[in-house]
C-alpha cells in the first residue's frame, strides 16, 4: 500500500482524528505549526499522539522566512533539534522562502547529524587555537577535511596542543594533536 501523508497541527488532533490515525497504518503525519511557540505546540502534539497510543511516523514541518542562511540554521536547529533530542519526530521538512532548496536540505542534514538522528558526513572537532598552538591550525584543518570528508560517520578531532587536545577529543575516532611535531591518535575501541 502506498503511504498517505496528512498535514496536521496540534488543533487538528481531535479524538476522531486520533482514532483514524490509529486505524490506518499507511498514514504519515506531517506535523506543522504556525504557533508563536512552535516547539511547544509540536511537543504537545507529540504527547497527545503518544497518550492516545498512535504509533504513526511523524515528520516535523516548519516554515521559515529567512534570507540569512546562518539565521535559518540557528532558528531551525533550535526548533527541530530540541524535539529530535527529546526523541520526537521521524523526519524533518523545512521550507524557507528566503533561500534555495539545497540550503534547506543542507540545514536539515546538519540538524539530523548534530542530534545523532542520521549520520551523513564526517564530523570534525577542533579548538579555536591559542598561544600554545605550534602550527597553522586552519590550514591543517582544511587539509584534513579535504582528505577525509568522504569518510561518513567518523569523528575526527584536530587540536592545536597536547595540553587540552586529548581530553577535548576523547570521543573522536581519530585525533590530530600538535606538540612541536604532530601526533595522530586513534580511539582505543570501536565506536557504535
Spell out what each predicted region is.
Residues 1-10, 26:
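Long, compositionally biased, glycine/small-hydrophobic-enriched stretches that function as flexible linkers
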Residues 2, 21-25, 169-170:
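Flexible, charged surface loops at secondary-structure boundaries
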Residues 12-149:
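Catalytic alpha/beta core domains of metabolic enzymes, predominantly
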Residues 60-86, 154-181:
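Active-site-adjacent loop and "lid" segments of alpha/beta metabolic enzymes
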Residues 100, 182-183:
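Glycine-rich nucleotide phosphate-binding loop and flanking beta-alpha elements
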Residues 185-192:
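Conserved small/polar residues in nucleotide/adenosyl-binding loops
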Amino acid at each position: 500500500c502506498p503511504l498517505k501523508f496528512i498535514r496536521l497541527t496540534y488543533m487538528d488532533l481531535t479524538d476522531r482524528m486520533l482514532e483514524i490515525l490509529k486505524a490506518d497504518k499507511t498514514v504519515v503525519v506531517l506535523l506543522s505549526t504556525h504557533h508563536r511557540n512552535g516547539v511547544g505546540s509540536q511537543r504537545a502534539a507529540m504527547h497527545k499522539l503518544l497518550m492516545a497510543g498512535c504509533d504513526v511516523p511523524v515528520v516535523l514541518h516548519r516554515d521559515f522566512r529567512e534570507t540569512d542562511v546562518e539565521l535559518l540554521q540557528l532558528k531551525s536547529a533550535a526548533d527541530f533539534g530540541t524535539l529530535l533530542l527529546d526523541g520526537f519526530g521521524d523526519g524533518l521538512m523545512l521550507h524557507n522562502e528566503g533561500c534555495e532548496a539545497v540550503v534547506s536540505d543542507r540545514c536539515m542534514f546538519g540538524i539530523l547529524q548534530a542530534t545523532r538522528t542520521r549520520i551523513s558526513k564526517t564530523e570534525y572537532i577542533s579548538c579555536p587555537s591559542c598561544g600554545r598552538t605550534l602550527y597553522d591550525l586552519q590550514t591543517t584543518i582544511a587539509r584534513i577535511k579535504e582528505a577525509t570528508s568522504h569518510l561518513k560517520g567518523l569523528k575526527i578531532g584536530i587540536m592545536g596542543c597536547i595540553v587540552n587536545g586529548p581530553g577535548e577529543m576523547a570521543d573522536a575516532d581519530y585525533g590530530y594533536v600538535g606538540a612541536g611535531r604532530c601526533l595522530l591518535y586513534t580511539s582505543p575501541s570501536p565506536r557504535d
